[in-house]
Amino acid sequence: QRLEWQRDPVEIHAFHVDVPAGVKQLHLEFEFVTPTDTSQGRVTMTPDLLGLQWEKTLLYPAGFYARQIPVAAAVQLPAGWQFASALRGAQRAGDTVQFATVPLETLVDSPLFAGPHYRRVELDPSSQGPVRLNIFADTPQELQATDEQLDKHRRVVGEAVALFGSRHFREYD
């Protein structure tokens, strides 16, 4: 059933929707048009790369804390693309990836990166909380990194533990 809606005349990011009594869930579809040039804003998508910032592509009800809004996010990727995200519980069926339900607060803190040219490097595979570097590039050749470059990233892991005194994560992508 189509619901009538109107953009708020003052708060440009707010919408007013007439929701019938008793409705517990809405299924919403809309298109997000990303900047294609830095003069228009932050470019987050090219023909071969995607940096999906969930907060730019979602609608949620006003009057609730983000940590109290459960979200089951899904994304449809172009054929042959791979992805990486801090979101867990990903199930892929064809080109559609469905993630486990998380609070909205977690979703917006877990961007998704995707593209056809992808490489994952284990920076610290320890059981104390593995740390991985996910690399996406415009071409396969750009995925290459020297041992010296990767060693710098590996050292940052140890330096962060020394600085903060512990690992405040189960795993880090």
Segments from the language model and where they lie:
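Non-catalytic architectural context of zinc metalloproteases
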Residues: 1-156, 162-170
